[in-house]
Amino acid sequence: MKQTLLRRAGLALDMWHLFRRQSQLCRWLQLTVSDAGAAAPANKVEARWLGKIRIGTCAHHALLVPFGSQAAYRFVAPPRSRLVAWCALAGGGSQHGNVEFVATVRNRQQGQERAARLRLSPSQEGADRRWHKLVLELENGEEQQIELTLATRTEMEDRVATPSALWGEPLLEWPRPIGELRGALRVAGPLARRGSFVAAARTLRGHLSEGSYHSLYQIWLREHALSPAKLADMRRRSTSFPYRPLVSVVTPVYNTDPRWLRACIESMKSQAYPNWQLCLADDGSTRAETRALLREYESDPRIKIKMRGTNGGIAAASNEALTLADGEFVAFLDHDDELTPDALFEAVALLNEQRDADVIYSDEDKLDLDGTRTEAYFKPDWSPEHFLTNMYTCHLMVVRRALVERVGGFRDGYDGAQDYDLVLRLLDQTSRIHHVAKVLYQWRRIPGSAAAHEGAKPRAHDAGARALEDYVRRNKLDAEILPGALTYVYRIRYRIKGEPLISIVLPAVPDVGHRDRRNACERMLNMLVEGTTYRRFEVLLPVDRGRAADLTVNIPQNLAVREIPMDAAAMRGRVRQQKRAAADATGDHLLFLDWGLQATDREWLTALLEFSQQAAIGAVGAKLHYPDGSLKHIGIVLGVNGVAAPAFHLHPRSSLGYWGTAVAVRNYSAVSGDCLMTRREIYSEVGGFDDEMGGLADVDYCLRLTRAGYRVVFTPYASFVQDRSWHSIGETDGREGNSLQTRWRDRLARDPYYNSNLSRDTPDYEPALTTSSSVE
C-alpha cells in the first residue's frame, strides 16, 4: 500500500510539472558559433551536437562548446519563461582547477542581460560524475526577442588534457496554456473514469512530454510492421506488374564505416522488387576497410562499383555513379542509410498506376545507432510553395533517368544541397511529381551528420540558398531569398507587381456595448491607418440600412471607409455581410478580415499580397494567435472529426508545428476566413462565399478554389493577435458540418496536405493508431 501511494505521489508530481510548463528544445534551432574572446587552442573544434550521452544515471543530448568559443541561439521567449540546461564533464578527471559554464540571456529589444554560472572541478567530479542542472529565470512577464549564449571557460593550461565540457539539452520552458491539455485529457479521461489512476497518469504524461510522439511512432511501427507473409506477397505481385522498369540506385561512397555501408548494401539485397541495380562510386576513400568491403560485393551482377582515384565531392561521386546506371529510373541512397524492404516495390506500384510520373518521393524516418527508428516525417503530397521554402521531399526519391541527364545531373558547388538543386532544376522540366505515403527510407543518425542534427552541416544550408537563388534567376522571378526560422528553411520574398488596389472587406460592426470590444474594434481600424507599409486599399463596411448613422465605433478621420447599406435580412451572419460587401468591391484583390485583429508587424499586407498576386494561388491565409500566446490558425486540416479543424490549435505561439509547419510558407487545403486574401476575378470565377455554409464557408470556398486548379497558401509572415471573444474557427453548428460533408465527402476523407498516416482525431500531426494503446 505504501509503495502504491509513493508511486502515485511521484506520478502526481510529474504531472503537476507537465501541467505547469511546456518546453522547446534548442537543438532544433539554428546554431551560430563565434569566438568568446578567450584564446582558443590551436586544435580547436567547432561547437557541435554529439548525440545522446549518458553520464552517471542520466542521459541527455549533448552539445560540445569548446573552450574559447560560444554557441548562440535566437528565439522568441513567451511570457514567464526560463532557461533550463544541464552541464557535465566527460573525460579525464585528475586535473586541478575549475571549468566554468556560463549561460547568458540578452533581451535583443532592450539590451538587458542576465547570466547564470556553474563551476565544476574535474578532480572532484571524477569520483561522482553526473549531469548538473542550471536554471535561469527570465524576469520580464512579456514576450521577448532573446539571444541565448552558451560558453565554457577553464583555468587549466593543458586544454588538450582537460575533460570535455558538455551542455546537455538546453531548453526553454514556459507555462502551458490550459487549452493545450484538451487532447491529452481526451486520451487519458477514459482510463481515469475506469479507476486506473496510474495508467491515466502515464498516458497523460506521455501525451504531454517530448517523448509522446516517439512512443506513438513505436506503436505505429508495430501496427505497420512488414511481416514475412507481406513481403512474400510483394515479391509475388512484383512478378505480375505489367510495367517492371529497371531501377538503378545511385550511392556515392566515401570513408564509410563498414558496418553502415554493409547495412546499406544489404538493404538493397532485401528488396521485394527484384528488378534493381546498385551503382556505387567510391570517391577516393582513404579508409582501407571501406574499399575492402566494396570489393566483397563486386561479384554480384546487380551491383556496379567504380573506384575514383581522387576525392571530388558528393556531386562528382554521384555523377560517376549515374554513369553506371542502366535503369529507366534512378533512386538516390546515401552510403550509411537504408531502404525498407518494400521501398522499390511501392515506387514501381505507383508507376504502374501513374505511367507518366517523372519524380516520386516517399516518407522517411531516422535510424539511431542502436537500430531504434524515430523522427518519422509523414509528408504532404506535392506542395510547390512548401518545396520552395525547404527540401521536404528529400528521401526516398526516384526520378526518370532521362530527365536527370537532360538537366545535367548534379552540379559542383552545391554539396550538401545537391539533391535540392537537382529537383529545383527538374521543376523547370516537369510537374509530374507523385508522393508515396509510406516510410520507405531510413536516415542513420550518426554524430555530425544532417540526420543527427540539422545544423551539423551549415555549408549545406548556404548551398541550398544558392540553389534557390539560381531557381529564381532561371524563372525570372522578381524576388529575393531570405533566411527562414530554421536551418534548411528559406523565405522567397516576392516583390509586388505594380500597385494593385486591395479591397478590405469587414463584417458589420458587432454589438460593442462592452468597452473592451469597442476598443478592440477601434484599435483594428487604427491598425489599417498606421500598421501597414502598403497604402493602396479601400475599406468596405456593411451597415444596417435603417441604422447607417448609428455606428458604435469611432472611425479614424484619415481612413476612407465605404459603407455598404444592407437590409436587415442581409445582415444575418458574417459571411452574408462580407459576400454582399464584396460585390461592391473595386479592388484587384479582396481581403476578408474579422474584427479584433492586431498585426505583429507592418509588412503583413505585403506578405499576403505577394502570394495573392501569383496566377496559381487562389487564396492566402495568415498566422493567428490569441493574447495568451496560444495558436489560433496556421492552416486548416480536412477530415478532423469528420469535418475540418485548424492545425495545432491552442499550441504555444512559439511552436514550430510539424517539421516547421508553423514558421514557414506552406500549402494547405484551406485557410481561415478571419484573414483571407484572394483575387477578385477568382472570387467571381468560383462563385464567392456560400453563406449557407456559415462558419465553414471559408473551407468550402478554398475547396472550390482547389477544384478549379488553384492552390491555397499559409504564410507566417502575416501574423496577428486576435481576442478570443471574436469569431472562432472550428466552432460551427452540426448543420454546417453536415452540409460540408455532403458536398465534399471525398475531399474530407483525404487531405493531400495532411498525410494519411496522421490521426484525424486531432489536427496535431500525431501518428494514426488503429488500436487503443496507452503511451508509456
Where are these regions (language model features)?
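Gly-Asp-aromatic-enriched flexible segments
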Residues: L5-V187
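Nucleotide-sugar donor-binding/catalytic module of glycosyltransferases
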Residues: A201-A456, D470
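Conserved donor NDP-sugar-binding/catalytic core segment of glycosyltransferases
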Residues: D342-T374, L597-V643
